[in-house]
């Protein structure tokens, strides 16, 4: 009977060890899978931000260019009439400004970096100020500030973009 008892105890101990090993392996596999899923989600978010920022650079460039054309049109009209910002924009330029501004606005709201979003909002406020100016001195100053700020925002986008590449796992 003693041999049978030892056999039974050995079988029970072996089964318990096997169950414990399976539980530990399952927990580790679940933890690894969870970590891999988190890394994948993080990389998808990083890729989305990279794509958004690259599109935003193009959109912002288009908006800056369109507003500069508005400034030049106002300048030409001022030379003819002596009044700043009183002439309506042509339909094509008006649409160009509208589409460029809309695209910049939509893309900027997708940006995760709060500082960058705030910087873009400040720039867009200066661009609006430039377009709405009714005085040549105000318009010239707004143009100078907006174009300088545009360069600064482009550099800020570049910094955020580079940080997203630097944050990749090797």
Which positions does each model-derived feature cover?
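Short hydrophobic membrane-inserting helices
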Residues: 1-13, 17
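Conserved non-transmembrane functional hotspots
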Residues: 20-170
């Amino acid at each position: 009977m003693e041999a049978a008892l030892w056999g039974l105890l050995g079988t029970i101990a072996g089964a318990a060890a096997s169950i414990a090993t399976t539980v530990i392996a399952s927990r580790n596999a679940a933890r690894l899978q969870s970590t891999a899923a988190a890394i994948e989600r993080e990389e998808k978010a990083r890729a989305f931000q990279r794509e958004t920022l690259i599109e935003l650079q193009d959109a912002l460039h288009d908006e800056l260019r369109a507003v500069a054309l508005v400034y030049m049109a106002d300048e030409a009209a001022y030379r003819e009439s002596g009044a700043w910002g009183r002439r309506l924009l042509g339909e094509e330029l008006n649409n160009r400004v509208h589409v460029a501004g809309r695209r910049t606005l939509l893309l900027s709201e997708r940006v995760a970096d709060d500082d960058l979003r705030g910087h873009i909002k400040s720039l867009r406020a200066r661009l609006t100020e430039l377009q709405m100016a009714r005085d040549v001195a105000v318009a010239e100053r707004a143009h100078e500030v907006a174009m300088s700020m545009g360069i600064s925002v482009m550099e800020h986008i570049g910094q955020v973009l580079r940080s997203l590449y630097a944050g990749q796992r090797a």
